[in-house]
Amino acid sequence: MARSTPCSQTSLAVPNHFSLVSHVTVPSEGVMPSPLSLCRCLPRELSPSVDSRSCSIPLVAPRRAGKLFLGTTPPRAPGLPRRLAWFSIDWEQVCLMHRLGSGGFGSVYKATYHGVPVAIKQVNKCTKDLRASQRSFWAELNIARLRHDNIVRVVAASTRTPEDSNSLGTIIMEFGGNVTLHQVIYGATRSPEPLSCREQLSLGKCLKYSLDVVNGLLFLHSQSILHLDLKPANILISEQDVCKISDFGCSQKLQDLRCRQASPHHIGGTYTHQAPEILKGEIATPKADIYSFGITLWQMTTREVPYSGEPQYVQYAVVAYNLRPSLAGAVFTASLTGKTLQNIIQSCWEARALQRPGAELLQRDLKALADSIEPM
């Protein structure tokens, strides 16, 4: 079967099921179970485990000129039920370019889908904790069908995998950019053009990026979604210099958290950015993301790492002794603007979640501060 869109070969080693996608065979039965139990808070039609067929979750459909549009239904393949046709990724249109990164979760590739640049995440089965891998895969789809300028959009996702692969599934996402906020802060970048990051992250730029992130959080929280792993490494910067929140593998829906109040479970994330209530095993709220944002804003402002020392000691000190990164630097004390920024950061990482501002109030304060300084 020939590809309808030719793909140039790459010298990088990539999985066979992508480089030879026209020869992929997928299991005809079976689907990865959802880690979420069915309850009154989770309707049956939203549970991925209800249908026994392998499924995908396409969120946009191709139209003219290979562009992707939201909310339209693609033509149904002959002989396929309506739902199964809607749940089909056009694998022949997947064309890998190169790998962007890899880790315990799997690998992310830059690619094109129907001629449009995308990022493709291949989620691996974790032999030590398969349940955690499954939970992470489905959590990535919490933003299914959502669209916002400051959120990396999911294009499609599928539990269909080659029979010989170690993959739980595939997620096709909007290509958010080559550079993360972490790379901009600390100087390392994968951008094809050299970037002297240490000279370019001005206070005005920090506030601009901060507003991008807060706008994304405000939208997520309005949809009752918590990110729960917000940090510079999970914020992409597009070619248009717009920050986009990515990596929703730890995200939660508020209604699902309410379902689990009687049986708390471990919430993933990065210990340096986790709120005290999360470290104590309490139920998460949107204010946990605000805490993480406060640490992230401190990193942007100081260009330093939050903590040093063993993780378990840091976690204990954050909860027991209210340990936080230092706000004593000149960037916070030498000017009225710095002192205002200091107050904003301090309010974000208050020990009690109720004392932290919501995303809407934070957006207002950051915009007022950004308007008070000279243009970038």
From Swiss-Prot:
Q: Which CDD domains match?
A: STKc_Mos
Give EC number(s), comma-separated. Answer: 2.7.11.1
UniProt-recorded Gene Ontology molecular function terms: ATP binding; protein serine kinase activity; protein serine/threonine kinase activity
Q: Which UniProt keywords apply?
A: ATP-binding, Kinase, Nucleotide-binding, Oncogene, Serine/threonine-protein kinase, Transferase
Reaction(s) catalysed (UniProt annotation): L-seryl-[protein] + ATP = O-phospho-L-seryl-[protein] + ADP + H(+); L-threonyl-[protein] + ATP = O-phospho-L-threonyl-[protein] + ADP + H(+)
Q: What class of enzyme is it?
A: transferase
Superkingdom classification of source: Viruses
Identify the catalytic residues: 229
Q: Give every Protein kinase domain span.
A: 94-376
Q: Record-annotated residues binding ATP?
A: 100-108, 121
User: What InterPro entries does UniProt report for this protein, alphabetically?
Assistant: Kinase-like_dom_sf, Prot_kinase_dom, Protein_kinase_ATP_BS, Ser/Thr_kinase_AS, Ser/Thr_Kinases-Pseudokinases
Family classification:
Belongs to the protein kinase superfamily. Ser/Thr protein kinase family.
Q: What is this protein called?
A: Serine/threonine-protein kinase-transforming protein mos
* Source organism (scientific name): Moloney murine sarcoma virus (strain m1) (MoMSV)
What gene does this protein come from? V-MOS
